[in-house]
Amino acid sequence: MYKAFLIKYGEIGVKGKNRFIFEDALVRQIKFSLKDVEGEFDVRRADGRIYVNALSDYDYDEVIESLTRVFGIVGICPVVQIEDNGFDDLANQVINYLDKAYKNKNLTFKVNARRTRKNYPMNSMEINMELGGRILDAFPEMKVDVHKPEVLLQVEIRGDVINIYSIEVPGPGGMPIGTAGKAMLLLSGGIDSPVAGYMVAKRGVQIEATYFHAPPYTSERAKQKVIDLAKIVSKYSGPITLNVVNFTDIQMAIYEKCPHDELTIIMRIYMMKIAEDLGKSSGCQGLVTGESIGQVASQTMASLYCTNEVCTMPVFRPVIGFDKQEIIDISEKIGSYETSIQPFEDCCTIFVAKHPVTKPNLNIIKQHETNLDGVIEELYKTAIETTEKIVIE
């Protein structure tokens, strides 16, 4: 029935002279989202709108599912597009549309007509009234309700084409990917960091990710778990380059030479340093973490102060004020929760002190870091140089 989808967007519409940049980015992301959907589609801007036109048979539910993951979209409207062959033809097409779209006709409705072509022989109010009358004649069981109709019939007269639709599937909102710069996500196998990546991507940020692997203490299944999480996030963010850093030697050096109650915070400091260096080399302008205040020892205010101090890039923590259940709710919504709870430990959970410091003093931490002098420099360089890059699409 539907050969086209009208894409509605929110914030993009107020971007003034730069609007086309955001619209083009949204078109690219829509095309990416449909690449694995069976069928052929044409995505284009036309008359101030974005349309997805189906050029072959397709699975309706699959298209809707893909489009509801595209940031920047606030509504997806399956439309029937007709040529302007006069009002009688329009009325017949509307009646045919309602007959097919709604098996139960015992519904209230409202007609909302709009014209961009002002030379149409009827104004919007006249179209509303005439179409409403034709609908009542065709379906006597339907009733008019202009305040809270069950069916809001939209009729848009644009140039020589008329759009007819009454269904609007909510989109995720946000901004198109790539319109707000690029950031490096510190991605672990936990619940929080995939959610953090999702949330900054929603604001138009392109995501790259870094995962710290510690073989033989962490398994290949733990690594695959993170790859799977990156794939889930990429359904929303678009392609992700995943940097897999071999962190074992650095962790062992910290374990052997630094106070055990400071293991977590010092390891976290080196993770931030490495992620920032990798990010600088690929054009990132910030770091993203899944830290939430007070959730674990490395996420107290004092601990976050210490890890922030080593970074020159801004550090974004989208879930900083969320409690655990709020983060879990989002992870379930985006489909990452079941993967995150798979029982494969990463390096953050293996080298953990029994009684980690919760109020680290930055000056003392820096002093204890000097225990690594003469050792850490070469290990750090090797970790950067041997980083494995995996492109997730």
Region roles according to the model:
Residues 133-135, 172-180, 251-252, 256-334, ...:
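Active-site adenylate/phosphate-handling loop in enzymes that bind or generate adenylated species
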Residues 48, 244-250, 292, 345-353:
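A glycine-rich phosphate-binding loop feature that marks nucleotide/adenosyl-phosphate handling sites
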Residues 338, 342-393:
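The feature marks non-catalytic terminal segments
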Residues 1-184, 194-241, 309, 357-362, ...:
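RNA-binding accessory domains that recognize and position tRNA/RNA substrates
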Residues 185, 209-211, 244, 289, ...:
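Structural beta-sheet core signal
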Residues 190:
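Conserved G/P- and acidic residue-centered "switch" motifs that form tight phosphate/ATP-binding loops
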Residues 230-257, 346:
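A conserved beta-strand->alpha-helix junction
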